[in-house]
UniProtKB/Swiss-Prot annotation:
Disruption phenotype: The double mutant della1/della2 exhibit slender shoots, early flowering and reduced root fresh weight. Impaired arbuscule formation during arbuscular mycorrhizal (AM) symbiosis with AM fungi (e.g. Glomus versiforme) in plant missing both DELLA1 and DELLA2 associated with a reduced expression of AM genes (e.g. NSP1, NSP2, PT4 and LEC5); these phenotypes are phenocopied by treatment with gibberellic acid (GA). Keywords: Gibberellin signaling pathway, Nucleus, Transcription, Transcription regulation, Ubl conjugation. The lineage of its organism: Eukaryota, Viridiplantae, Streptophyta, Embryophyta, Tracheophyta. A motif (LxCxE motif) lies at residues 221-225. InterPro entries: DELLA_N_sf, TF_DELLA_N, TF_GRAS. Belongs to the GRAS family. DELLA subfamily. It comes from Medicago truncatula (Barrel medic). It is found in: Nucleus. This is DELLA protein 1.
Length: 594
């Protein structure tokens, strides 16, 4: 199957596992035009590739095959020789012509690299087509090179598909590119002097990670398409190819592609039940808190809205739909302790899932918070509720007391209710019966709840690529400063555990369906619609919260790539141009809250 693919050619660096071959192919960049030297190099190539042929049996080169190029091991000597000839032919043209060629001309996909190079040589230099096997005509190597750079040579590039390669060249152009280079007297030779690095604009064929990255993304999308079309045989072949392409990448791209490959494999081969308990999930959550500003931003912006809503109240009650390790509340307690006129009585209701070992983790968190409250002089009361789903909560269980100001807080919790129809509506009805002064919601800014698998996969790929990029960028700065605020782990350990934390989400979004797919993130626009339908009104997060959130990011290592954006009274945190999480605040209309 042929496809159009734009490439830039002029020299080549092609690597495989044979170091001798790699060094030889790299020599195509500096070509000696002395006859004896050319003969010796060609003989060396012949011997090297003859041995390669005997070793590999003339099969396809595995590394180049993984990158999409079909080159038999027995043909690689010819490919190397022809790439040298191709560079010399194209080098005789004007620099402007080559630039024009690389940018305005469409070259067809050179998956069959041997035939493609031969075709290019034929089109650029018809005389070279008469030499089918360079290794069989060793005596004419010098003649070939000399003819290639004949001052009177003219090559018609109009045969290449696309626009004319370059305007008619002036005479004696090639002669201007030749000069004598002083060598030891024993080996006099006339060679082409390589131009200075800053002036070398000739395109070079490289097996680089950028091209492989494009192939990787296309293969990921093709695999998702095959799964949606239930072509599991094709999907299985593609997912194996994804793993190979991912191994050729570095940094965030390699990591995120590997997690998506694992998720696709789970969907193809089945989903063995995961046995990771909630305590381990909370450990991953804490490492994610340390390695990035996302949870810090979520806690800060929600606390600011709650603090403003509690202004003047003598008794306050916070209901946290996902207490976890209680990391959000020390900052709020300290802010309440500094309130003019003295701190209010602070009551906290924490909700969490059951533990695998049946330990009372919520009470342990409550005890630590009680110790802090005693230290800073805040009257504190804690109660924990263990439940499998916040949809199971009943308003009477929460024991709302007369005269206390109530706030409901949900950070990355409500989207899990979307797996069961009607659960979100039930939770919001419960909240309305509680009659809080404010409801704070933090959710991922992504749409991973659509009905079409490919659309969901595409959105997730873009979203988590940005998240992994931000982790990579911020933690490189953290490693340089070698700082860690809590002592939970080194920056590298926090990064690794955070990647596992996000990898679990990727797996759930891609591999699971039905009630098992709980990572059903929706956008701020979608949550606005849901909250409005449930009878809530938006609360504008003030400019003070925006300024303080921006200051928080400025203090965070690697914060240059993060940005805070105000969106119709809500605050969003993103990485460069992509918004990733959103904080919103809500209240009931005045006539309902009375």
């Amino acid at each position: 199957m042929k496809r159009e693919h734009q490439e830039s050619f002029g020299g080549g660096v092609i690597s495989n596992n044979n170091k001798t071959n790699t060094n030889h192919l790299n020599s195509s960049k500096n070509i000696n035009f002395g006859e004896c030297s050319s003969m010796q190099n060609t003989n060396t190539k012949q011997n090297m590739w003859r041995e390669e042929k005997e070793t590999n049996g003339g099969g396809m080169d595995e590394l180049l095959a993984a990158l999409g190029y079909k080159v038999r091991s027995s043909d690689m000597a010819d490919v190397a020789q022809k790439l040298e000839q191709l560079e010399m032919v194209m080098g005789s043209a004007q620099e402007e012509g080559i630039n024009h060629l690389s940018s305005d001309t469409v070259h067809y996909d050179p998956t069959d690299l041997y035939s493609w190079v031969q075709t290019m040589l034929t089109e650029l230099n018809p005389d070279s087509s008469q030499i089918n096997d360079p290794l069989a005509s060793l005596g004419s190597s010098s003649e070939i090179l000399n003819n290639t750079f004949n001052d009177d040579s003219e090559y018609d590039l109009s045969a290449i598909p696309g626009m004319a390669a370059y305007p008619p060249q002036e005479e004696n152009t090639a002669a201007k590119r030749m000069k004598t280079w002083s060598e030891p007297e024993s080996e006099p030779a006339v060679v082409m002097s390589p131009p200075p690095a800053v002036e070398n604009t000739r395109p070079v064929v490289l097996v680089d990670t950028q091209e492989t990255g494009v192939r990787l993304v296309h293969t990921l999308m093709a695999c998702a398409e095959a799964i949606q079309q239930k072509n599991l045989k094709l999907a299985e072949a593609l997912v194996k190819h994804i793993s190979l392409l991912a191994s050729l990448q570095t940094g965030a791209m390699r990591k995120v592609a590997s997690y998506f490959a694992q998720a696709l494999a789970r969907r193809i081969y089945g989903n063995p039940e995961e046995t990771i308990d909630s305590s381990f999930s909370e450990i991953l959550h804490m490492h994610f808190y340390e390695s990035s500003p996302y949870l810090k931003f979520a806690h800060f912006t929600a606390n600011q809205a709650i603090l403003e809503a509690f202004a003047g109240a003598g008794r306050v009650h916070v209901i946290d739909f996902g207490l976890k390790q209680g990391m959000q509340w020390p900052a709020l307690m300290q802010a309440l302790a500094l309130r003019p006129g003295g701190p209010p009585t602070f009551r906290l209701t924490g909700i969490g899932p059951p533990q695998a070992d049946n330990t009372d983790a919520l009470q342990q968190v409550g005890w630590k918070l009680a110790q802090l409250a005693q230290t800073i002089g805040v009257q504190f009361e804690f109660r924990g509720f263990v439940c499998n789903s916040i949809a199971d909560l009943d308003p009477n269980m929460l024991e709302i007391r007369p005269g206390e100001a109530v706030a409901v807080n949900s950070v990355f919790e409500l989207h899990t209710m979307l797996a069961r129809p009607g659960s979100v509506e039930k939770v919001l009805n419960t909240v309305k019966k509680i009659n809080p002064k404010i409801v704070t919601i933090v959710e991922q800014e992504a749409n991973h709840n659509g009905p079409v698998f490919v659309d969901r996969f595409t959105e997730a790929l873009h979203y988590y690529s940005s998240l992994f990029d931000s982790l990579e960028g911020s933690n490189s700065s953290s490693n340089n400063s070698n700082s860690n605020s809590t002592g939970l782990g080194s920056p590298s350990q926090d990064l690794l555990m955070s990647e596992i934390y996000l990898g679990k989400q990727i797996c759930n979004v891609v591999a699971y369906e039905g009630v098992d797919r709980v990572e059903r993130h929706e956008t701020l626009t979608q949550w606005r619609s849901r909250m409005g339908s449930a009878g809530f009104e938006p609360v504008h997060l003030g400019s003070n919260a925006f300024k303080q959130a921006s200051t928080l990011l400025a203090l965070f290592a690697g914060g240059d790539g993060y940005r805070v954006e105000e969106n119709n009274g809500c605050l969003m945190l993103g990485w460069h141009t992509r918004s990733l999480i959103a904080t919103s605040a809500w209240k009931l209309p005045q006539n309902e809250s009375k």
